[in-house]
Amino acid sequence: MANNNSGNSNNLLVPGAAQAIDQMKLEIASEFGVNLGADTTSRANGSVGGEITKRLVSFAQQNMGGGQF
């Protein structure tokens, strides 16, 4: 697995993806009434991450013909 100085091995393949994910994170947090940050519970912050994953999987399924993998 590739490793870089930041300790994060997730390499973005699409320019601008990080900004799009950050925007999605802020929109979902707003929908859920969650103020993201260190003072928020792990459960609340995690609910936002879980919803991001759910929406990204749904988006991928729709764009791949809706097939099960």
Curated annotation (Swiss-Prot):
Top-level taxon of origin: Bacteria
Biological process annotations from GO: DNA topological change; sporulation resulting in formation of a cellular spore
GO molecular function annotations of the record: double-stranded DNA binding
Swiss-Prot/TrEMBL site (Cleavage) positions: E27, I28
Transmembrane segments: none
Alphabetized InterPro entries for the sequence: SASP_alpha/beta-type, SASP_alpha/beta-type_CS, SASP_DNA-binding, SASP_sf_alpha/beta
Keywords assigned by UniProt, alphabetized: DNA-binding, Sporulation
Function recorded in the entry: SASP are bound to spore DNA. They are double-stranded DNA-binding proteins that cause DNA to change to an a-like conformation. They protect the DNA backbone from chemical and enzymatic cleavage and are thus involved in dormant spore's high resistance to UV light.
PANTHER family linked: SMALL, ACID-SOLUBLE SPORE PROTEIN A (PTHR36107:SF1)
Family: Belongs to the alpha/beta-type SASP family.
General remark: SASP are degraded in the first minutes of spore germination and provide amino acids for both new protein synthesis and metabolism.
Listed name of the protein: Small, acid-soluble spore protein A
Annotated source species: Bacillus subtilis (strain 168)
